[in-house]
Amino acid sequence: MDVTDELRTRVRGLIQAMPGAQRDFAAGIGLDETKLSKALSGARRFSAGELVRIAEYSGVTVNWLLNGSDEAKTVTAVPAPAARSIRVPTDLEPRRRILETAWQLIAERGYHRVRVADIAKACGTSTATIHHYFPTKTEVLNEALRRNVKLAFDRQVAELHAVQDAHQRLLRLVELQLPKDGLLRDEWSVWLQVWNESAINPKIRSLYWDSYDRWYNTIAMTIRSGQEQGVFRVRDPDKATAQLTALIDGLGIQVLTGRPGSSVAAMREHLHDFIDQNIAAKPVR
């Protein structure tokens, strides 16, 4: 049984374990039932986005879908235990909706301007229901961060597991980190607030660093892989990682804060130039 056969088998198992029929599962992941049936039969492949939605809806990771284990070695670093979402065997959908809504509100309004009552109103539920799942607003934020770490991990595994060339994989990682309008810009907005909060609240720092380290280690392992392949120059991979991640952070802040002349396109160009001139075995241009 190859990887794609095993993937289909795992998805079938998830469908059987979830309440409702296959059409309900398809609706839950936002996929046409015919496309789901074709993917399960092998007539088409699951896209990266579909794998992420299946994992999110079912409460598993894309790494588990592809490799059979959350801990399996893959192309990105696995989240530290402290940065992982709490496993909940039931009530996945209400929790997901609360965390997704809270994340969106925090991205748009700011953490300190969002009340539990605001989250409840946006979810169409009561504050008591929110408190049933998350006793405090801080716990909502912490679990929303863990969920975001999982989603980033899922996206990276889904997008990159078949990309063998480390240079191309690094460029794709950069692309997945750009603060484009929509989901990625919202993520940057929340993480900027987390940086600020962790600077004045030591209690949140360990979760922040556990979360950030997964991203940092993913860049580091990609650079090491490129050195082994001969596509990246032989130099200290930790130093190169520190420089590249610092550049990504700084340029991202400039884009989000509207610095004149900054843009996603300019950020991409600066990062590609840095990789070409400082990491690639030979300058590309």
Name the predicted role of every residue range:
Residues 1-18, 87-90, 94, 103:
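A short, Lys/Arg-rich alpha-helix, primarily the initiator
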Residues 44, 48, 70, 92-100, ...:
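An amphipathic alpha-helix adjacent to DNA-recognition modules
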Residues 49-64:
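DNA major-groove recognition helix of helix-turn-helix/homeodomain DNA-binding modules
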Residues 105-139:
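Helix-turn-helix
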Residues 143, 158-186, 241-244:
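Hydrophobic alpha-helical connector segments
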Residues 169, 183-205:
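Amphipathic alpha-helical segments used for helix-helix packing
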Residues 183, 202-228:
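Amphipathic alpha-helical packing segments from all-alpha helical-bundle domains
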Residues 205, 209, 227-278, 282-285:
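Hydrophobic/aromatic-rich alpha-helical bundle segments in the mid-to-C-terminal region
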